[in-house]
Amino acid sequence: MESTFHSDTLDSFPNYQENSLNTNEEQTNPLESLRDGWASSNSSSSSSLLLPDENEGNEVFGSLKGLVTQSKFGQWANKLSKSLQARRRKSESISKPRVYYSVFMAPSWVLHAEKHWEEYPHYAGYDYKDYVRLLDATKEAIAHGVFPVLISKGSSGSYFVKNKVQKNIAVFKPKDEEPYGKLNPKWTKWFHRNLFPCFFGRSCLIPNTSYLSEAAACVLDRGLGLYLVPYTSVASISSPTFNYDYFARKAFLTRNKPLPEKTGSFQQFLDGFVVASKFFAQHPWPGTRHRETREYTESVASSEDFDIFDPFLAENEIETEFWTEELRLKFRFEFEKLVLLDYLMRNTDRNLDNWMIKICYEPCDNEEYYKSINLLSTNLTPNMSANSVDPAISQTSDFWKGPHFQIGAIDNSLAFPYKHPDSWRSFPYGWLSLPRSLFTQPFTEFTRQLFLHKLTSREWWEKLSDDLRNVFNQDLDFDEKMFSRQLSLVKGQAYNIVEVLKNPLMNIYDLLELPNLYVVEDVVRIEVNEPTSANSEEAEFGLPIKRDYGSILHPSCSQTFPPYPGSQLLQATPGRSFSSNAEALLPLNYITLLSKDSSSPKMLKDVIFERLQCASSNAVFSTC
């Protein structure tokens, strides 16, 4: 490994400076070189991480390197380096088998729909090209002396990023300034960590991954086609206004040494949006008593403060000058997207101050809005027929020509837990403090069709899993087992969503009343036909090549596979029945379900069988 240390650290060795100038034509960043040394598979010893390479004639460096290498510290560093390299190579080269049996079953009216909606109607959102443009504008502004500004609210080091004209364009959250990061500039969490260790952190979340959770929320949002989360990605920025340790700050001030770049989440700034608490204070939802004097930012209120409405009688809601019937329907259309997104990624920190609302008074020219109008049932009684999924487009409707809403889901740093929260601190969703009538209406047909189509697609889940893994894999402490647990929880939440959306009369309250689940993947080796071509899935499994995730059936089975051992089914879930008898069917007995064509050559193949697992509801005293 070539030398990556600064010359000022070795002022007493002039020969090294001269030799390094002759051997290294291109100088590299010392921090990047050190990080690459820990992760590079070409590094063979820890001494290359601790000392630069010396010439054969340099006796001083030879003796120093020998002492370090032979010492216990050098041996420990060598083992640590190799273990980190092996774990990184293992996580990068992982190849999972494909899912052969899934718990997600799509209804027939979704499988046979002529039109599958891929995304919600939305306005032009930021993409990767816009993110690169904003990042370049940020670095250019910092070079001209326009530095990010610390946000006073919140418990972590978050910064408003500005361009050269002092306009907010993004929000940056460094990793080491997270709520419990070592360089958090706010003292609240320092007191929590040092004086109240019993109430430190959230045991259901992986520590120091909040910045990755922000980026993963954007990946999930784009995968579902919601466009609620502002475009977010991981970036590296350095600025004097960031919180650095004493040595980095002193080197910058005294020796003019550049400040090291900080890695964190870089999120687009939402212009023209208002936080939900202020919006509902200005425009109270109709049907709430004492709405002139009561704030919506309080905790979940009792039912006495709200009028209880019949979920199918919209006329019980009082129509105001602002909240007309059409405007209420438009807001529900956007609000249920936020509910499903938070539920799917199990956001543990959603309140009325970290999601935003914008009213657009300009006429909507988006053709997708006109296409979706007939999918919004104005009488709030959905229809499950296939014709309702692909309705006739009425271009004459002026439903979307008036004011409409946009919702921004910001601050998703405390999402994607690896286990469900303990029952003694469950982290309820903050939007539950809104009036009851927002939650008692059934989901719109557009939402039901789009979510069922995506959440029961094997290809969609495979792509989402790869995209989420690429996000969380950016951290040097990435653990594949912990990521699998995170994905298992997301799939458990998705299973509840699928089961609720199958019923056209279920609403948000019905979704939140379901038990917490995990979807566990069991790798099973089965006997299949030997493939004869590149696209030979039909010949290999005896199944059609083009099939949906929830419709994986074998010709020898009449409707579906027998119950999988160990699966736990909810008695309240209609149309499903699981067996808890482990002897009912052994995993390898699935081999008998394959094609009985003995003339075809056979081969063994690893596949995945999914099963449900209920989360423990017992309260366990642990850090929160």
Curated annotation (Swiss-Prot):
**Enzyme Commission number(s) of this protein:** 2.7.1.67
Q: For the PI3K/PI4K catalytic domain, which residue ranges apply? A: 145-520
Which residue ranges are recorded for the region named Catalytic loop?
A: 346-354
Its GO biological process terms?
Answer: endosome organization; Golgi organization; phosphatidylinositol phosphate biosynthetic process
Which of UniProt's keywords are assigned here?
A: ATP-binding, Cell membrane, Golgi apparatus, Kinase, Magnesium, Manganese, Membrane, Metal-binding, Nucleotide-binding, Transferase, Vacuole
Q: Where is this region: G-loop?
A: 151-157
Kinase listed as a keyword: yes
Q: Where is the composition biased (Polar residues)?
A: 1-31
Topology in the lipid bilayer is annotated as:
Peripheral membrane protein
Report what the protein is called.
Phosphatidylinositol 4-kinase lsb6
Q: Which organism is it from?
A: Schizosaccharomyces pombe (strain 972 / ATCC 24843) (Fission yeast)
Q: Tell me the gene name.
A: lsb6
